[in-house]
UniProtKB/Swiss-Prot annotation:
This is GTPase Obg. Keywords: Cytoplasm, GTP-binding, Hydrolase, Magnesium, Metal-binding, Nucleotide-binding. GTP binds at residues 169-176, 194-198, 218-221, 288-291, 316-318. It is found in: Cytoplasm. The keyword Transmembrane helix does not apply. Belongs to the TRAFAC class OBG-HflX-like GTPase superfamily. OBG GTPase family. It comes from Oleidesulfovibrio alaskensis (strain ATCC BAA-1058 / DSM 17464 / G20) (Desulfovibrio alaskensis). Residues 1-162 form the Obg domain. Its cofactor is Mg(2+). Residues 125-150 are annotated as: Disordered. One of its GO terms (cellular component) is cytoplasm.
Length: 366
């Protein structure tokens, strides 16, 4: 499927129907009083979070969403029908920003939970018929109130994947191999950097409780300067902003005995520069590909980690060694941590990119 995480659209609510100018005309009542009905209210534009959608691709194809106008009032005090609301489904995790005339943006909706509905543009109010304007001094008003126009809003949509755990690290750290081992996701895997070019999602199931599951996001490899957009880092980092915790994977090939944990520190510095709240997110640190070193050298790294006061898991995702301990720790953190992390909406918003990406999202079948 086509994965798009940003789009610009317009939402236009319905206009209110005009009030009616009418007078009662019946047999033997040639000069009845005013009986013009009210116009109907315009329809609202409503955004609804849906688990059916995983991308904003549809909003690149259709960019204008308009609700129905209210119908005008009629004689005999008949009110016009209200316009139907337009309900637009959005992927769960979509942020809706309103764009002002000066280019400034403000967050108006956060569709972070399934089935949440938010009225984005309110329909115009219907006008009153001339029966409302009758008085002792004006018994035959020949005017009515026009309906109010609807709202028109220019919106930018931004999708942030809602995952429980986010995998991150330097390129070629083995994140895709890890997610393929612990979930049903089947990302592209090869022995060269930047194999993963778009986020992959996997779902890890509890073997003892089928209803217990964990959504994992495999984020493409990050490089130095990612917070400034190097290697499209700013496009990828936003997808881990809402995770409960991070699984930080470092390849043993990137471990230097003089400063073995420099790879962890580099990525953590990028997280801190991108968003301070993300930089302080709980994380599990993992050294992968221990099958490439003799066991005694791996034991030396374990001792070094303990001496440095770091809790680091040593694994071989390819051979499955050490995965059980990491998975157990992930389940523990899932139970203890909340996903509702603060949103830093003050960070400068990047302009909408023109490129699109392909991504395969695989879910476990029950």
């Amino acid at each position: 499927m086509r994965f798009v995480d940003e789009a610009v659209i317009k939402a236009i609510s319905g206009n209110g129907g005009h009030g009616c100018v009418s007078f009662r005309r019946e047999k033997f009542i040639p000069r009845g009083g005013p009986d013009g009905g009210d116009g109907g209210n315009g329809g609202n534009v409503v955004f609804k979070a849906s688990t059916r959608l995983l991308s904003l691709y549809d909003f690149r194809l259709k960019r204008v969403y308009q609700a129905e106008n209210g119908r005008p009032g009629q004689g005999s005090q008949m009110h016009g029908r209200g316009g139907k609301d337009l309900v637009v489904e959005m992927p769960v995790g979509t942020l809706v920003f309103e764009r002002g005339e000066n280019g400034a943006e403000s967050l108006i909706a956060d569709l972070s939970e399934p089935d949440v509905e938010v009225v984005i543009a309110h329909g115009g109010r219907g006008g009153k018929g001339n029966e409302h304007f009758k008085s002792s001094t004006m018994q035959a008003p020949r005017f009515s109130q026009p309906g109010e126009p609807g709202e028109e809003k220019s919106l930018r949509l931004e999708l942030k994947i809602l995952a429980d755990a986010g995998l991150l690290g330097l390129p070629n750290a083995g994140k895709s191999t890890f997610i393929s081992q612990v979930s049903a996701a089947k990302p592209k895997i090869a022995a060269y950097p930047f194999t993963t070019l778009v986020p992959n999602l996997g779902v890890m199931m509890d073997e003892f409780d089928p209803d217990r599951r964990m959504v994992i996001a495999d984020i493409p490899g990050l490089i130095e300067g990612a917070h400034e957009g190097q290697g499209l880092g700013h496009r990828f980092l936003k997808h881990v902003e809402r995770t409960r915790f991070l699984v930080h994977i470092l390849s043993i090939e990137d471990v230097d005995m003089e400063n073995p944990w420099a790879g962890f520190d580099l990525i953590n510095d990028e997280l801190q520069r991108f968003d301070e709240t993300l930089g302080s997110r709980e994380q599990i640190q993992v050294v992968n590909k221990i099958d490439l070193l003799p066991p005694e050298e791996v034991d030396g790294l374990r001792a070094r980690a303990e001496a440095d006061g770091r809790r680091i898991f040593f694994i071989s995702a390819l051979e499955g060694e050490g995965l059980d301990a990491v998975v157990s720790e992930m389940w523990r953190m899932l139970a203890e941590l909340d996903r509702n992390v603060p949103l830093d909406s003050s960070r400068q918003i990047e302009p909408e990119p023109e490129e699109e990406f392909d991504v395969e999202v695989v879910w476990v079948r029950e």
